[in-house]
Amino acid sequence: MTIKSDKWIRRMAEQTGMIEPFEPGQVRQSNGQKIVSYGTSSYGYDIRCADEFKIFTNINSTIVDPKNFDENSFVDIKSDVCIIPPNSFALARTIEYFRIPRNVLTICLGKSTYARCGIIVNVTPFEPEWEGYVTLEFSNTTPLPAKIYAGEGCAQVLFFESDEVCETSYKDRGGKYQGQHGVTLPKT
């Protein structure tokens, strides 16, 4: 299994629609202002956060149960920024829609710009033949409110191509998050 380069990422995005919309270079400014970078990097793709957020709330004093998740545990926000309360959590989604090839697995890591501020981005791997918008998980590990910027970079996707095609892909087994649109809550 080998990590794929910027040339491969550009070719796959342009020829197969692996990433849409796609930025072939690295964007570091918008309207003359510095931003958290996004787009193609040497061996990965820096994804952007859309303007749809779900922020945890404790209004109902609900127990968080991944097998029986209460949607009322979140407050929905549509904004160019998201303020995550201290020691709290938010969900978002990517601007980019992904179509992962059958012989590829991705790993997604948070950007150091956020990590150095105590904001951890968690995303599980994109499995072979998974497609959809990526649901992003942001944890604010600090005792202070933390800000996330929509339309800017938040994590980097690394692409690994296998030496052998898998027998059963995510699509083959009817993965529960296949084709997701919007911020998707836990499913069992």
Curated annotation (Swiss-Prot):
Pathway: Pyrimidine metabolism; dUMP biosynthesis; dUMP from dCTP (dUTP route): step 1/2. It catalyses: dCTP + H2O + H(+) = dUTP + NH4(+). DCTP binds at residues 111-116, 135-137, 156, 170, 180. Pfam families: DCD. GO terms for molecular function: dCTP deaminase activity; nucleotide binding. Belongs to the dCTP deaminase family. Catalyzes the deamination of dCTP to dUTP. This is dCTP deaminase. It comes from Janthinobacterium sp. (strain Marseille).
